[in-house]
Curated annotation (Swiss-Prot):
It comes from the Eukaryota. This is Potassium channel subfamily U member 1. Residues 1047-1091 are annotated as: Disordered. GO terms for molecular function: potassium channel activity. Residues 1-24, 123-137, 187-188, 248-259, 283-290 are extracellular. Its main location: membrane. The chain crosses the membrane at residues 25-45, 102-122, 138-158, 166-186, 189-209, 227-247, 291-311. SUPFAM superfamilies: NAD(P)-binding Rossmann-fold domains, Voltage-gated potassium channels. Regulated by changes in cytosolic pH; activated by alkalization. Not activated by intracellular Ca(2+). VU0546110 acts as a selective inhibitor. The auxiliary subunit LRRC52 shifts the activation of KCNU1 to more negative potentials at a given pH. The S4 segment, which is characterized by a series of positively charged amino acids at every third position, is part of the voltage-sensor. Residues 331-473, 710-881 form the RCK N-terminal domain. GO terms for cellular component: membrane; monoatomic ion channel complex; plasma membrane; sperm flagellum. Belongs to the potassium channel family. Calcium-activated (TC 1.A.1.3) subfamily. KCa1.1/KCNMA1 sub-subfamily.
Amino acid sequence: MSQTLLDNLNKKELTETSCTIEIQAAFILSSLATFFGGLIVLFIFRIALKISRNWKTVKGPRGILELFSSRRIEVNPLRKLYFHGVFRERIEMLLSAQTIVGQVLVILVFVLSIGSLVIYFINSMDPVRKCSSYEDKIVHVDLSFNAFFSFYFGLRFWAAEDKIKFWLEMNSIVDIFTIPPTFISYYLKSNWLGLRFLRALRLLELPKILQILQVIKTSNSVKLSKLMSIVISTWFTAAGFLHLVENSGDPWLNGRNSQTMSYFESIYLVTATMSTVGFGDVVAKTSLGRIFIVFFTLGSLILFANYIPEMVELFSTRKKYNKPYEAVKGKKFIVVCGNITIDSVTAFLRNFLHRKAGEINIEIVFLGEAPPSVELETLLKCHTSCTTFVCGTALKFEDLKRVAVENAEACLILANPFCSDLHDEDNSNIMRVLSIKNYYPQTRVIIQMLQSQNKVFLSRIPNWNWSAGDNIICFAELKLGFIAQGCLVPGLCTFLTTLFIEQNQKVFPKHPWQKHFLNGLKNKILTQRLSNDFVGMTFPQVSRLCFLKMHLMLIAIQHKPLFHNCCSLILNPSSQVRLNKDTLGFFIAESSKDVKRALFYCSNCHSDVCNPELIGKCGCKNRSRQQLVAPTIMVMQSSLNEFAPTAEIYTSISREQTSSVTILTTRNMPVDTADDSDMLDSSGMFHWCRSMPLDKVVLKRSDKATHEFQNHIVACVFGDAHSSLMGLRNFVMPLRASNYTRQELKDIVFIGSLEYFQREWRFLRNFPKIHIMPGSALYTGDLHAVNVEQCSMCVILATPYKALSSQLLVDTETIMATLNIQALRISCPMSGSSKKEVNTSPTFSKYEGKQRYQQIPILTELKNPSNIHFIEQMDGLDEAIKGTSLHLSTAFSTGTVFSGTFLDSLLATAFYNYHVLELLQMLVTGGINSQTEHCLVKEKLYEGNEGGATFLSGRTRCKLGLLSLDETILSDIKPKKTFGQLFCGSLDNLGILCVGLYRMMDEGEHNSERKRFVITRPANECHLLPSDLVFCAIPFSITCDKSESNASIQDQDTTTNVTSMSQGSNFQGAQSALNEHSLSPASAMGEKKSPQLLNSRVYPLNLFDASDIDPGK
């Protein structure tokens, strides 16, 4: 036994000999000589090549060939170059791992490099100052590895275009300092560790190898592998250098200060140094080692402080956000995907969670395509009880399965309104919808869209179902629709906006008008099923009862005709429409608790109740309609005595009719001649004209005398040839609603780049009375050319998205144009004006002895609401609430500014109550909502069909207007001291529904510009002022002017009709439109047809894809 052990020791001594300084120097110098020698040769070759090229330029292209080339090369000098190029190209393909052979070669080189590193680890167990004998078998294995590395090095050198750059690459340095010593060991018959630790740098190729093997596929895994390879290769290389110098000692001391340090101890020392801890149990004693530790500590501060935390974060994030969401039975949740950023999530949570304040019972699962940022992660932690984040995409079935879309209440898709390409953003969201519907067709989807022309693709998805709650929120359609209403009536844009925003900021009003405005902000659009005690009653009766007894303003109902499948939303229906069972009502009220009174109302229990707070659920179970309707009407008649005008007022405008179809008569309908016959689209809802070439509508500054516009609409657009289309068709459609006669339509004059309008024109060419002035709103000459001084409204549309360094600059052009237009004030002396001029100009000062002036009415769109302070400064009023948001600003209260940022809140509205969203779409788009679109697409009604009854009712939509108390038909309502008296009197006698006021800010002298502010749903006891203007829902057949002879000519101050509202049968009007050459058939009940309708013709117009319009028409 002892003899065997002695033999092994003797054998090990034979294979290990002491390495002298000369042997170590031979290994080191071989690498240095190869490196510097090769570098010098390459430099000399490059200099010689430059000299030869210069010589070739001087002596001609054949100068070098004549001196150095043989005759055979002269005969065919390009043949060798051709084969050289082909061979080089094949090598490049091989080394880039683009072929299977190349991939095998790259993987083989990496594996052999790791094998060589393992051999180094084995040899490092022996003392560094000992040399292994060549009889060791491991030495032969390492020699074969390095021989293959030499071959691979030669291929890389051959394929390199820049040889010097290749020579200085890290992989080349590793090969130069590890391959030559191996061949030196073969010559010296001994092997030394030397610089073979540099093979550890080959670990940097690990991410590339893993990608070739398809082990890692995601960006996070690639990033994690790169960080790990950098840290590990740095550890091993630094430990190898310390292992070498500490065991060898300083060269100038002949190794007298060396110490025995194993490779594991070297790794331990490097790790302690990298973490900047340093326990002191293992330290460097050599000068070289200590100098290296100093520089390595500085480098490790960067490496450890950045890479290690990032690796931990990637590893934890991948594990944290890749877990599937566990749906709990009985707990509701929704999935939100698309544009998941800190801004979009903040806006969504603010609006969505506010709807259920105090009782959040719906969990929100965010499906993001990238891990959340630090800010987003912090926000989610603040709502950790109701939010979950999962990394994935809605385009993959496995990710949809992880978030359990099949069990979700709905899937909401967020859009990015600030993206550079709106069309691509819509397309990506449409693909998400298609993926979700393919995965689980019954999933309810609510999607945000940026451009209205892309909505048609969603309706073509086979599993898209409007009736199941699928809905579209189109930013361009709603935003431009709001602005269009503000163009038709001052303040209406603000009035409609206040009904859909949430105001939580606590403010303290300084002026009386601010108190009225803030009280109006408390009101919202709410829905509630009406009590069955209202069955059989007319809408005016129910609305009056709700207003007086419950202090609720009922403005619309959802009605389903007997012979029609689509439910229609009807604003202020006529007395012909009677309520059915479980009718859905739309109210303007402050809280959902208040509108519950309309559900609990009982004619038996609450007929004598005067306090609306006492109306609650009663114990009545069996109710008879015959017993309940009569008492209800008696209550209303008894309450009428206080507000009813005299019997001889407006007896000819009675709303009591027996026909089930609205009949228009000549006594209250403006008359047009046959020469001015209207042409409508096939739905009967919009005015239409034959396709107009663009050059026919382009105006010239020199022709101003030929187009003296008055009472027109000026729209300033800042797009160019490369801007995203904003969809001006959505702006024009509400202004061309068919419930206006052709004479009532206002000219629309666009100012902007002609190149931009050339791209938009195919969507506008079939709308009448549109003009284009090439130019800019920043140039005063262009404004004067379109007679902006005489316009009824000048709207400044926001600039299409541009990539800017600051979001505060997105409204620069808009603000500058506003400043430019506001500077154009028209002043004139008071003495030469007539009373009629004063009455019809609300912006004129009425104080004698003072010079009066008129400011051009402006409506400015802001993309960034924080820029409102620029507009406030222009207004010149110091009455704004300081430090508040846009919706509390003076400019917003007066209706001169609009921002579409509040449209984000409609996503929550669409989920909780999509009926409110449908009402909003109907209000701002001229009568089109999702139900209308569904019927139009399903029945292809835009192709035109025969029959006239539905066409007649298609034009009888209600329209909002702004009426004066003195100069219109409201002047005969007696009494009208309070808003409650006006509401009941106008509803009973005229069928007009009053919903708000447009009041002077101050009757004092300092309000020289006669600015007005909006009051949404005034209180019943609110006292009226003689100067008040009233927002009203006016039936189509009612003439608002006090003089019927001037019914078609309405002054701006006295009567301003606005947006078209879907009157009871507007969906019926979309069902069967007349074809191009047909006339309206006679109505029933022996009524005479209106000449206006007799001369109206209908032409087909695709409401959803304007590009399909036949240009030949």
